[in-house]
Curated annotation (Swiss-Prot):
Family to which the UniProt record says this protein belongs: Belongs to the radical SAM superfamily. CofH family.
Protein name: 5-amino-6-(D-ribitylamino)uracil--L-tyrosine 4-hydroxyphenyl transferase
Domain of life per record: Bacteria
Stored SUPFAM superfamilies: Radical SAM enzymes
Gene encoding the protein: cofH
Subunit structure, as described in the record: Consists of two subunits, CofG and CofH.
Catalytic activity: 5-amino-6-(D-ribitylamino)uracil + L-tyrosine + S-adenosyl-L-methionine = 5-amino-5-(4-hydroxybenzyl)-6-(D-ribitylimino)-5,6-dihydrouracil + 2-iminoacetate + 5'-deoxyadenosine + L-methionine + H(+)
Length: 391
């Protein structure tokens, strides 16, 4: 593909046009350094137009409440069987302790997900257990934003209890869920899913649950697990499905939307040998993740303005570089992270606010704390300065 074609695609994108799947594939398959530099420049310019120069971050905590899981995804090093020596399942006191710690450290969000544990029930039902998880936190900390339970977990509860997805989502919402993580998406292509995660929900179910959440007024995020067995065509197919989903929510005037898109590069160090052999490496290729992030900005930016790298997957230096490739947000502090770390990631499990701020400042961009829905949050330090200044 010659430069002229790439330039024409990029010029159209800068004029505000949505590029086609075929054009997305053209961009994603470029190997020439000049063409890739043009893609990066365009993504960076669109980021500036669509999201501004300020880089945002959120103070949040992950709570992975159990690693006991009935499924056996080929890339997952987190799951354990009930009875394994290193299996765990947090009790209510443990959930509260982690929540208290999060609030003490200034968190505005708790992100809560876990393995699919068949015994996670109250009176023989799954939904009451998940509701108690939420109520345990919300009764003590009503102000905290609970970003909780992936579409896979919604389907698990519905299947275990014989419920409709809408009924499960409404019940979770009423008990305190404020937004839904768009994880378990991996790649929205059933051919890939049959290899990576054959027991997981299929593409249509993931899309249905996310769309149902939007109809019911529950915002969601969106993700892609990249850099394993998927092709550029399948990556673009994934982006196209997300764009279509957001277009439907917008055109139908649903009360909620996708708030952000996150590239999650595959970390395979602890993955099963068969998948490791097929992928051929254990850590992400930064250049591939950056190019996908740039193309995602060009492809999705008109519809999903906020794009985030994963410092857990890429390391802080890689995530900071992604801010020059179309990303406008650097993610959260997390405070603890098990799923990616157990897979062999080297990015760490916790990031101090000052570390994130310094990373953003190192590329000459201003920073701003935000909440889960991308509204600015005034830090305690900013508030103190305001009070002193007004005094």
């Amino acid at each position: 593909m010659n430069y002229k074609t790439v330039d024409v695609i990029l010029e159209r994108a800068l004029l505000g046009d949505d590029i086609s799947p075929q054009e997305g594939i053209v961009l994603l398959t470029q190997t020439d350094s000049g063409a890739i530099a043009s893609i990066r420049h365009t993504a960076d310019k669109l980021r500036q137009q669509q999201a501004g120069d300020t880089v945002t971050y959120v103070i949040n905590r992950n709570i992975n409440f159990t690693n006991i899981c009935e499924q056996h995804c080929s890339f997952c090093a987190f799951r354990r069987n009930d009875g394994d020596a290193d299996a765990y399942w947090l009790d209510w006191a443990g959930i509260l302790e982690k929540s208290h710690d999060a609030v003490q450290r200034g968190a505005t969000e708790i992100c809560m997900q876990g393995g699919l544990h068949p015994q996670a029930q109250i009176d023989g039902k799954s939904l009451p257990y998940y509701l108690k998880l939420l109520e345990t936190i919300k009764q003590e900390y009503p102000q905290i934003h609970l970003h909780a339970f992936s579409p896979q977990e919604v389907q698990f509860i519905a299947r275990m209890d014989g419920l409709e997805y809408a009924g499960v989502i409404s019940a979770l919402q009423n008990a305190g869920v404020n937004s839904l993580p768009g994880t378990a998406a991996e790649v929205l292509d059933d051919q890939v899913r049959r290899v990576l995660c054959p027991e997981k929900i299929n593409t249509a179910t993931w899309l249905e649950i996310i769309s149902t959440a939007h109809k019911l007024g529950l915002h969601t995020t969106s993700t892609i697990l990249s850099g394993h067995i998927e092709t550029p065509e399948q990556q673009i197919g994934h982006l196209e499905k997300l764009r279509s989903l957001q277009q439907i929510a917008t055109n139908q005037k649903y009360p909620a939307r996708i708030t952000e898109f996150i590239v999650l590069p595959f970390v395979g160090q602890e993955a099963p040998k068969s998948l490791r052999r097929r992928v051929g490496r254990d850590q992400p290729v930064l250049a591939d993740a950056l190019l996908l992030g740039a193309v995602a900005r060009i492809y999705l930016g008109n519809w999903i303005a906020n794009h985030q790298p994963s410092w857990v997957k890429l390391g802080l230096a890689g995530a900071t570089e992604a801010l020059n490739w179309g990303c406008n947000d650097i993610g959260g502090t997390l405070m603890e992270e098990h799923i990616t770390t157990m897979a062999g990631a080297v990015g760490g499990t916790c990031m101090e606010v000052e570390t994130l701020q310094n990373a953003i400042a190192s590329i000459g961009r201003p920073y701003q704390q935000r909440d889960t829905l991308y509204q600015p949050v005034e830090s305690a330090k900013q508030l103190a300065n305001t009070v002193i200044g007004n005094g």
